[in-house]
């Protein structure tokens, strides 16, 4: 996981610091893959510690945070994703392809990343097996006379 050091994203540290429950943030999606265009949104996954607000209060704070991030970056839209609440495959994809843009609690982040990687490695053979059977099913469906 590399730490991104681009001027616009460095400015985000000052915004994220106002939210002590955010352990780290990852930029992912088209802005990392180099496929962004004028219509692209900015995808940011945030890793939240246990001391975060709950329910509506958290949603309100995340919406306001997305607004502030969009304003700083000059982006039309920012998708702010709560990484904790997503599935293991999504989490692994963010860790594998994303760039770390904020890190206030490295110990918490490393523990989270380690857990995701271990769970993914345990599950990967099953995932590959399922993908193989799904592909065989599609091939069989389209090659029948």
Each model region followed by its residue ranges:
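Catalytic core of pol beta-like nucleotidyltransferases
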Residues: 1-24, 32-38, 51-145
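Short hydrophobic/aromatic beta-strand micro-patches
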Residues: 45-49
